[in-house]
């Protein structure tokens, strides 16, 4: 019996009048993973395309894999030296025994020696990242399925993207219950309340992170959360620049100064998926060439960031080191690159019109640098900049449409 035949045999049980009718969204979600729905348009004019919402979301999901895998490796790369800086051999064994992450990693064969290999670092990072991602995926999927069953519509695959994006923009040390709470806020409050996929005006992943930032700031900001070593305190390079300028950039665990190339490659502490600009750009290129993301938004963000950073460089300041940060450092520090490629380009919460996309992107770039520089107490400005621009996206589209209407009327 072929798979397609099995799916067709099960279909009557889930369609109207079947015993499992109320669970049709679950059947439809599973069936369309393997086969395109057999729906046709009712009108004569229609457009045929090989890509649909499911495949678009899966493309974005795969596009973040380079940043995800590097992020897992980097968690181990930052954690093991930090543990050796804090503890001797006997103390380290006791710490490993008292921490379930370390215990699981050791059971999987991870070496905690100072010369541990890349596989040990990758595995250790996976032990921190995968529980967060699995928690977020299950909880986010639960809300998606629940709302689909209650509203009697198909399950949208948006939670595939929302879940992995959310898991990649939080620290590796985030408690699992807070991860569940954050994704619940993002999916329910920022998306489903407004009608679900395609109707939300805020990015759900960023809304969930913003909720955690204001509700539980100690677990998602500060110096204690970015390196997954018990008792270790180390600021991110962005925070270091905010307090002491470019000369203050140093890897706290190793004492080695942080170069621009270190930041570009991702050899720095930070949120799991935001550290490697190189991997982010590789994934971003995939969704740009796949036409899932708009190059106009990306270009607008870069233009706004470069112009604003250059302006602050020219103005200068004797008291605020952030005025001196060049645009190419803004690009590789914090969540700028990840936000630009994967958050700002969200086709639902961004502007729809071509001219609106330019304005939307420029606003994000300007606001990110403005928040970073003018408010050094909160050096990471990309999250708030994108959420702020989400609110203005409908206005940009409205102004573009009204301008087109006036122009056409003036033609006679």
UniProtKB/Swiss-Prot annotation:
Its EC number is 7.2.1.1. One of its GO terms (biological process) is transmembrane transport. It is a multi-pass membrane protein. GO terms for molecular function: FMN binding; oxidoreductase activity, acting on NAD(P)H, quinone or similar compound as acceptor. The modification FMN phosphoryl threonine is found at residue 236. Its cofactor is FMN. GO terms for cellular component: plasma membrane. Keywords: Cell inner membrane, Cell membrane, Flavoprotein, FMN, Ion transport, Membrane, NAD, Phosphoprotein, Sodium, Sodium transport, Translocase, Transmembrane, Transmembrane helix, Transport, Ubiquinone. The chain crosses the membrane at residues 57-77, 127-147, 163-183, 270-290, 297-317, 322-342, 358-378, 381-401. It comes from the Bacteria. It is found in: Cell inner membrane. Its main location: membrane. It holds the Pfam family NQR2_RnfD_RnfE. The keyword Membrane applies. InterPro entries: NqrB, NqrB/RnfD. It is an enzyme of class 7 (translocase). HAMAP family: NqrB. Belongs to the NqrB/RnfD family. NQR complex catalyzes the reduction of ubiquinone-1 to ubiquinol by two successive reactions, coupled with the transport of Na(+) ions from the cytoplasm to the periplasm. NqrA to NqrE are probably involved in the second step, the conversion of ubisemiquinone to ubiquinol. Composed of six subunits; NqrA, NqrB, NqrC, NqrD, NqrE and NqrF. PANTHER family: ELECTRON TRANSPORT COMPLEX PROTEIN RNFD, NA(+)-TRANSLOCATING NADH-QUINONE REDUCTASE SUBUNIT B. This is Na(+)-translocating NADH-quinone reductase subunit B. It comes from Klebsiella pneumoniae (strain 342). The gene is nqrB.
């Amino acid at each position: 019996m072929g798979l397609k035949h099995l799916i067709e045999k099960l279909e009557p049980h889930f369609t109207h009048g079947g015993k499992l009718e109320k669970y049709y969204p679950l059947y439809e979600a599973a069936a369309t993973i393997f086969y395109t729905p057999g729906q046709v348009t009712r009108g004569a004019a229609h457009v045929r395309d090989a890509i649909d919402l499911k495949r678009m979301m899966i493309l974005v999901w795969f596009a973040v894999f380079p940043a995800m895998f590097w992020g897992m490796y980097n968690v181990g790369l930052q954690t093991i030296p930090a543990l050796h800086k804090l503890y001797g051999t006997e103390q380290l064994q006791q710490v490993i025994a008292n921490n379930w992450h370390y215990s699981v990693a050791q059971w999987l064969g991870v070496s905690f020696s100072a010369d541990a290999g890349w596989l040990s670092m990758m595995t250790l990072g996976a032990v921190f990242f995968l529980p967060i991602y699995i928690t977020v995926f299950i909880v986010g999927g639960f809300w998606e399925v629940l709302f689909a069953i209650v509203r009697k519509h198909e399950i949208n695959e948006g939670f595939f993207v929302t879940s992995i994006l959310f898991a990649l923009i939080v620290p590796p040390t985030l408690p699992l219950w807070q991860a569940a709470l954050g994704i619940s806020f993002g999916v329910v409050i920022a998306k489903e309340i407004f009608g679900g996929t395609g109707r939300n005006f805020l990015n759900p992943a960023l809304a969930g992170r913003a909720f955690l930032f204001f509700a539980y700031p100690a677990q998602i900001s500060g110096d204690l959360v970015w390196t997954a070593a018990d008792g270790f305190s180390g600021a991110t390079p962005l925070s270091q620049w905010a307090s002491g300028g470019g000369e203050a950039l140093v890897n706290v665990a190793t004492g080695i100064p942080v170069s621009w190339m270190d930041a570009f490659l991702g050899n720095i502490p930070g949120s799991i998926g935001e550290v490697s600009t190189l991997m982010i750009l590789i994934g971003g290129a995939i969704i740009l060439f796949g036409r899932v993301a708009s190059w106009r938004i990306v270009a607008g963000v870069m233009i706004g960031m470069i112009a604003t950073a250059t302006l602050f460089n020219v103005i200068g300041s004797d008291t605020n080191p952030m005025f001196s940060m060049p645009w190419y450092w803004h690009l590789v520090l914090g969540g700028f690159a990840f936000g630009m490629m994967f958050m700002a380009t969200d086709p639902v919460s961004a502007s729809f019109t071509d001219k609106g996309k330019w304005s939307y992107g420029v606003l994000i770039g300007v606001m990110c640098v403005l928040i970073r520089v003018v408010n050094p107490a909160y050096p990471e400005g990309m999250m708030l900049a994108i959420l702020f621009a989400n609110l203005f996206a409908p206005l940009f589209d409205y102004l573009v449409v009204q301008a087109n209407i006036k122009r056409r009327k003036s033609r006679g």
